């Protein structure tokens, strides 16, 4: 492990609180110690931290608040400053500075903002500063939220050009069944491809303390692995889990990266949360999946959501299954007008055209 590597460590609420109502500072100190040890060895560390709402609730003395988005954003606004202060305080013990980055989905959807976020993150790393990343919960609405820090950590790993992504949770890894209810469940140590059977095993279990369950961790692993990043799910309370994961020792479930990772532009397409979606017919589905063709307006059946030209959208077949993500050549209003029409009719219908395809194959990632 002598060569410098970049590791993204995602710490969920259940890890930071130990299942309690307050931040477990003693455990966070230990996690920081492990990160500082790797930092001293020349490795680059990125922290994706949950816990802003928990920190805000603790700081305000556990107030009785209505279960509304405004209440959560209030707690996040109070807690985020406390959280970053804690990370700075603990890393400073080892002479390490931290830099806060608060992101939303909009930072990933727009190519220019994506590149700006990437440059900021890499500048922090180049100057031996540990980036501490969280979603901007105090201002993010449902429309611009990534939604959970598992998927945010995968996007952060792509931005950082990471070698590994470590998702720390209250479980030792992915099991063949829920170990809390099935004593026969076995730990899955290695995964070389994520399929529907594995997604069914992961289910949608949530600890109740955060927004992510094993299902979202699988989504994050899928995104990261396709971008060439090994991903590990492991227990946050396992001794020296961060150092052992970095050294390649077995610590949980390892999702092995694709041997041929996506090039940079397609990493952005794959990582950006879709701004909308379109449903295509059987002919278009076959052309995309079997021939790698571009999507023509003729094959579009339904356009859902409101999105601009140049934004990433989800492409689904008539059964509702995701088949691809891609950059739309037209906005949602225009696509609704030309859906089901031949490409030669685009100019007559819209009064302009940006070419004969709705999504070009060079701007598309097959799911």
From Swiss-Prot:
E.C. no: 2.7.2.11
Gene Ontology MF term list: ATP binding; glutamate 5-kinase activity; RNA binding
Compartments, record wording: Cytoplasm
Residues that coordinate or bind ATP: 10, 169-170, 211-217
Residues annotated for substrate binding in this entry: 50, 137, 149
Domain of life: Bacteria
Pathway linked to the protein: Amino-acid biosynthesis; L-proline biosynthesis; L-glutamate 5-semialdehyde from L-glutamate: step 1/2
Keyword 4Fe-4S: no
Pfam families in alphabetical order: AA_kinase, PUA
Residues of the PUA domain: 275-353
Catalysed reactions, semicolon-separated: L-glutamate + ATP = L-glutamyl 5-phosphate + ADP
GO annotations of cellular component type: cytosol
Biological process (GO), any one: L-proline biosynthetic process
Alphabetized UniProt keyword annotations: Amino-acid biosynthesis, ATP-binding, Cytoplasm, Kinase, Nucleotide-binding, Proline biosynthesis, Transferase
InterPro entries the record matches: AceGlu_kinase-like_sf (IPR036393), Asp/Glu/Uridylate_kinase (IPR001048), G5K_ProB (IPR041739), Glu/AcGlu_kinase (IPR001057), Glu_5kinase (IPR011529), Glu_5kinase/COase_Synthase (IPR005715), Glutamate_5-kinase_CS (IPR019797), PUA (IPR002478)
PANTHER family assigned: GLUTAMATE 5-KINASE, ISOPENTENYL PHOSPHATE KINASE
Family: Belongs to the glutamate 5-kinase family.
Function comment: Catalyzes the transfer of a phosphate group to glutamate to form L-glutamate 5-phosphate.
NCBIfam families, per database record: proB (TIGR01027)
Protein name stated in the entry: Glutamate 5-kinase
Organism, as annotated: Klebsiella pneumoniae subsp. pneumoniae (strain ATCC 700721 / MGH 78578)
